[in-house]
Regions:
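Short, charged recognition helix plus adjacent turn
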Residues: 13, 27, 32, 59-70
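Short, basic-rich loop-to-helix N-cap that marks the start of a DNA-contacting helix
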Residues: 37-52
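Short, charge-rich amphipathic interface segments used for partner binding and complex assembly
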Residues: 48-62
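Recognition helix of helix-turn-helix/homeodomain-like DNA-binding domains
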Residues: 25-41
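A short, basic/aromatic helix-end/turn motif that makes direct DNA contacts
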Residues: 22-25, 55
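A short, Lys/Arg-rich alpha-helix, primarily the initiator
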Residues: 1-22
Length: 70
């Protein structure tokens, strides 16, 4: 689960649909990755693209720190 990314998305008002459009995938795929519903994470290139386009003022390591679901 990418809790930091989820929190910052809410603050910056960025949607799963916007991330999906940037990455060329469905919003549900983005949601599943961010919420930890799948074992797959973001590819490094995709994480860099998300950070550069939507969250340039936040560190990549902060945004994409994985947290385990309880």
């Amino acid at each position: 689960m990418y809790q930091n990314l989820l929190d910052i998305m809410k603050i910056e008002k960025i949607t799963f649909a916007q991330l999906g459009e940037l990455l060329g995938c469905r919003y549900q795929t983005v949601s599943d990755i961010i919420n930890g519903s799948t074992q797959k994470g973001f590819y490094y290139e995709d994480a860099m693209k998300i950070q550069k386009v939507f969250f340039p003022k936040y560190a990549l390591e902060f945004l994409f720190a994985k947290m385990n679901r309880i």
